[in-house]
Each structure stands twice: as structure tokens, then as C-alpha cells.
Amino acid sequence: MKTKNICCIGAGFVGGPTMAVIALKCPEITINVVDINQDKIDAWNGDLSNLPVFEPGLADIISKVRNQNLFFSTNIDQSIDVAEMIFMAVNTPTKTSGKGRGYAADLTFVENCAKNIARVSKSDKIIIEKSTLPVRTAEKIKEILDSNNDLNINFDVLSNPEFLAEGTAINDLFKSDRVLIGGDNTKSGNIAVSNLVEIYSRWIPKDKILTTNVWSSELSKLVSNAMLAQRISSINSISALCEKTGAKVDEVSIAVGMDKRIGPSFLNSSIGFGGSCFKKDILNLVYISKHYGLDEVAEYWENVVRINDYQTNRFGEKIIEALNSDLNSKTISILGWAFKKDTNDSRESASISLAKKLLLNGAKLKIYDPMVSVYQIVYDIKNKISEDGLGEQEIDNLISNVTVCENFHSAIKNSNLVSLCTDWDEFKEINWKEAKSIMSLNPTLFDGRNLVDKHQLESLGYQVYIIGKP
């Protein structure tokens, strides 16, 4: 049976771009992206320059398919009812309470999604896990679907994890390294897999579409993110050693990456990885490992997160040390709030932890990011500070020391220290000679992304610290 209608539940960083590309490549399929958040849906239907997800190339695709065969709405039940295939792209945050708190994935949204699908469905459905989920979640989803529907409907649950890097998501969708589809080895399961393969094969070569059982697919997504994060933590641990020994981490990265067995990807030292996936998925892997009694395995992967936290904290301590441990009369500029360039996503960004540390030590902050909104930056800081149990008035007092700026120049004006935290291209083009004229006397530059030439800036009169360099 050919798929004529797709419903995607969840209009976020995964659902929006993925469905846009499928709509572009499969114009005969009607796709409804639904979400309970009316503001988010309004944004998807609004100005192309202000979509809720910023990805290079996304707005152009949306302009071609929106209201043609791609629709955004809050009509969840209606969209489920008419769809033959339903993608689940809802959030799976780390649990904040109960068993597994701080490690396990919170499957509340997934479970509610499954219950709603079961309640509404009047015909057979193919259900596709697009969210990153723990191993054997498909089994739980299947149980919920079957136990909450009285019409003897067949639900086939597939795992089809996304492997998108924010900032390059559209290119990743067009030119995927692989598309992974996990399904049950049953007659209906194989038909369901074939239906999804048919959709992707419209633009992805068949040899890059990998089919496995459901459990291998679910685990592969967690392991992929864990191993990418592991590489970042590995080179970040070496950056600390470089600073002590006189080696340069960028030179070490190049030398190591030229070994074809290792390769150069994810060997750029920074103040720490961020984003919605890496930390969450590693902690999920830790929890699963502990659940099965694999304590040594759990400890191994948890150390990846510990090194990441160490790197961010180390950067903050270096800043405090550079200002003689007295931040009360100091203004510090944070350039970059998104966890990486070419995205407006600030989830788990190292800038958030850095800002909290500096504020609690008395600094005044001026923050600039070309894509992250003022609202989001203030929200992130408040949310992070509240983890320490501070009262509302204490939090407001700290927030009063934060200024979110509209451009780079206003962010560094009269600043004592500038911290480069995100690798935005515009930060690579800064004229530091001109910048020095509007900063305070004897300015200091902390480069957490290896973007500047240390000797050049020192010749201009800056004190310079670059992560991973003596």
C-alpha cells in the first residue's frame, strides 16, 4: 500500500526539517506536522525569516512546500486519523524526578503520544520512532497502542532515528551518510519497513538505507551520539595537557586526524559540547548500562560527561583567575550563546554554565548571539541559576547584571574581558584592532573556539588565552 498521508507529531528541530525535505522529495504525499504548541505552529506558518528552527536552506524549502503538500497545525486527532504513517518526533528529556532521575529518558510525551494515536485510530498505522529513545521503547509503545484500542487495528512500530547535526540538518537530510530503519521480522513489519524505504529511496541511494531489527536501530542512535561526544571530550582532555606542556591542541588535532584510522571529524577543542542530544543520550546509555548491571560500562561513558563539565568549568576558572578573582567591578562579554554556529538552539550550551559561574562570582555580563533571542538567553540563565535553589529575588538580582546586546560592538563596549564561546563565522571576521578602541584599558580575550591568532592580538595589546594553547 502506497503512503498518501503522513502525520508528524512534534514540530521541533527534528520534525520540522525532516518533514519539509520529505514533502519536497515526495510531492504526492500530504504531510501534516502537528504540535500542541500554538505559538510554534504560528511561527511555522508565519514569516519565513522567523521560523522556530533556524537551519541554512530550510526557509527556502518551506517556501516551496508549505500549504502545497506540507501543513502545520494543532489538529492532532484529525491528522492522526487520515494518516497511514505517523512519525513521533516529540521531546524525550532527561527525567528530573523519580527512578532514574538525572539519567533516564522521560518518556511521558512518547507514552501520551501513543495513547492518543491508539484512541483516535480507526485503521492500520505505521508508527515511526523519530525521537531518540532507550532500547526496547518500541516494545512499550506497541503495548500501549494495542491495549488502548478496541478496533483490532494493526500497529507496526519502526525505529528510524535521525542523524542530523544542527546547523547542517538540511544537507544531512539531502546527503545522509545512512538512513537506519529498524522493524520486526514479521509479514506486516517487513511491509512497513518497505513502505518507509520507498519514501527515502526517492533521494537516498538504496545502499545507504540500512535495515535492522528495532533494538539495534534504537541502540545505534544512542551509541552514535555517545561516540561523537567521546571524541570531543577526548580532545578537550588533551587541550588541558597541551596548556601544561607547551603543545598546541590544534596542531595535535591535525596530526592525529591525518591518521585515516581516526580521521579529523569532531577533533576541534572547545569549551565543551552542548545541544539537546549528546549529554542526554550518554546519560541514558549510562542508565541502561547500570540497569543491566554493567557498572564498568556505565562509568566509562559517564566520564565523557564529566570531562565535558570539567572543560567548561576550567574555562570559567581561567577567566576568574585572569581577573585576579575579583569580578565585582568587571564587565565580561560573552560572544555566542547557541551551542554551535548556524543554529538558534542553546540547549545545554556551555555558555549557559559559564554565565552562571561568572554571575555568581559578581560579574556583569554583556551577551550577544546573532540568532538566539533575548527571551531565550534570559530564560536559559534563570533556569540554570534556579538549579541552586536560589529565591526569586536573588535570581532577579543576578539577572539585573545581564545585558543582551543586538550586535557585537555594543556587546564589547567598555568590556574588561571578551569570551568567544560559539564559532559563528562573523566572529572570525572581527577587526580586533578596531574593537580594542571601544573596550576598557588592557582588554583580555578568552578564545574558547580557537578562532583568533594569539600573537597578532598580543601585538595589539590584548592579553590572550586560547583553549589548548600555552
Where are these regions (language model features)?
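Structural/interface elements that position substrates and couple domains in central-metabolism enzymes
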Residues: M1-P470
